């Protein structure tokens, strides 16, 4: 059941918010507000070290000595948090590794930080998601 409430914003903030709505192609302000609220609660789950889901992506030089072994070893150290991995050969030199993870936020962050710190990793990202349990 939806509940209606109102908020007050100054003109400048409302203008910025309406630009955001247009850029993201929301149908209305309510959808945009709901999305912002959900994102805030997902962030809170991570801050409170709750059970979360996430996606770690890495781009690395596969010619870097021992890097693939280090990536694999670190994943094995956190095997109980890894749901799935996908490895893509981007070109002759670069690989993309996508790792779907689940577990306590602190453990997931530790894995992501460990992978990002490896010599030869050119780019890394952790997309922080929720398990969905608290977003009804």
Curated annotation (Swiss-Prot):
Its cofactor is Ni(2+). Ni(2+) binds at residues 76, 87, 89, 95. Disulfide bonds: none annotated. Binds 1 nickel ion per subunit. GO terms for molecular function: DNA binding; DNA-binding transcription factor activity; nickel cation binding. Keywords: DNA-binding, Metal-binding, Nickel, Transcription, Transcription regulation. It comes from the Bacteria. This is Putative nickel-responsive regulator.
